[in-house]
């Protein structure tokens, strides 16, 4: 991705990662011509990225960016491992904070890169970025009760586990609802 690309100015760098808000051209390429994604990003893209959960969200996300270009940063972020210059996961939000200042975060690290601390490193950096915006008051996460790696990430972030929630799309499935308020963030 060129330095003149709109998403370049929002990059977040951590010791091992570069987080980039997914630009419209990458979202559209992923939907319509996946072979172009690596070229646009200037990074390696695993073939199994097309099978990740974020793919279902990309059409809605692309439309969100078309309707409101200032939404860049409040949707999908791409997690690039800098040493290999490879996409290793994605994370992000479902849009800008709502009227009450709440926002939901989600994340996924590809299987080959799990249990190496990348998830926490990325989520912590994105949480810090999000809470640098005064309109954000509360961050929400939903996590399957058996996803111990994600539970550890949420606990390390200082998120508070609230209660179990039913998943309407998946009968007999429950997830934990978590929250982090701006007052809990060390500034």
Place the predicted regions along the sequence by residue.
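Conserved active-site tyrosine of GNAT-family acetyltransferases
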Residues: 154
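Glycine-rich acyl-CoA binding loop
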Residues: 117-120
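Conserved beta-strand-loop-alpha-helix junction that forms the acyl-donor binding cleft
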Residues: 141-151
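A generic structural-conservation signal
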Residues: 122, 139-140, 163
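GNAT-family acyltransferases
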Residues: 1-104, 109-112, 125-129, 133, ...
């Amino acid at each position: 991705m060129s330095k003149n690309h709109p998403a370049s100015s929002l990059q977040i760098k951590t010791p091992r990662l570069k987080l980039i808000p997914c630009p419209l051209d990458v979202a559209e390429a992923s939907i319509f011509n996946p072979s172009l994604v690596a070229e646009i990003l200037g990074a390696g893209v695993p073939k199994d990225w097309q099978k990740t959960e974020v793919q279902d969200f990309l059409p809605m996300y692309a439309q969100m960016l078309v309707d409101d270009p200032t939404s860049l940063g409040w949707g999908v972020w791409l997690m690039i491992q800098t040493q290999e210059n490879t996409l290793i996961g994605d994370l992000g939000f479902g849009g800008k904070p709502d009227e009450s200042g709440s926002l939901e975060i989600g994340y996924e690290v590809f299987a080959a890169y799990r249990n190496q601390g990348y998830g926490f490193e990325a989520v912590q950096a994105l949480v810090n970025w999000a809470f640098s915006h005064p309109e954000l008051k509360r961050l929400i996460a939903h996590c399957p009760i058996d996803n111990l790696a994600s539970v550890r990430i949420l606990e390390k972030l200082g998120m508070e586990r609230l209660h179990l929630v039913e998943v309407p799309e998946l009968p007999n499935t429950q997830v934990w609802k978590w929250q982090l308020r701006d007052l809990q963030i060390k500034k």
